[in-house]
């Protein structure tokens, strides 16, 4: 050990004292993640409020961690939850098992399932980390109606999937805001 070693150590301490603080005040000031960040899942809706999920279970089959459970149900004219023949009657994502890989997003044929930038999913109760359909559904925007209700944007499911963006503009979804993002992400 050299004579000047303590002085070198104090030099590091003194130089650090005059630098800008890099500490983040986490719960009070939340960092906005990058747009490509894989956060909490969200089940999206059509512009009239019907669900995009058709209960095909492709997301559950694509999940390598077996974290997704989907049970499909059949739509009727009296109770219609999605434009197709089926809808996701029971939908669950187990965040104790989810690894955030995004393979479920790629597998979804209707772009019903997307990932938001929400990263706070920690909880002290294991049961609360199994998110149900009600927890994952996108909130209703102005002009949307709570399902079940008849198809408002067309006569068949092709009107929803082929002419979707045109129908969204006619339904009054503001420019720059999509049904997937909602008003909070359109402002960024």
From Swiss-Prot:
Ranges annotated as biased composition (Low complexity): 172-181
Subcellular location: Cell membrane
Alphabetized UniProt keyword annotations: 4Fe-4S, Cell membrane, Iron, Iron-sulfur, Membrane, Metal-binding, NAD, Quinone, Repeat, Translocase, Ubiquinone
Cofactor dependency: [4Fe-4S] cluster
Amino acids binding [4Fe-4S] cluster 1: 53, 56, 59, 108
UniProt domain 4Fe-4S ferredoxin-type: residue ranges: 43-73, 89-118
Keyword Transcription regulation: no
Main location, first listed in the record: membrane
NCBIfam families tied to this protein: NuoI, PRK05888.1-3
Annotated protein name in UniProt: NADH-quinone oxidoreductase subunit I
The species this protein was found in: Saccharopolyspora erythraea (strain ATCC 11635 / DSM 40517 / JCM 4748 / NBRC 13426 / NCIMB 8594 / NRRL 2338)
Taxon lineage: Bacteria, Bacillati, Actinomycetota, Actinomycetes, Pseudonocardiales
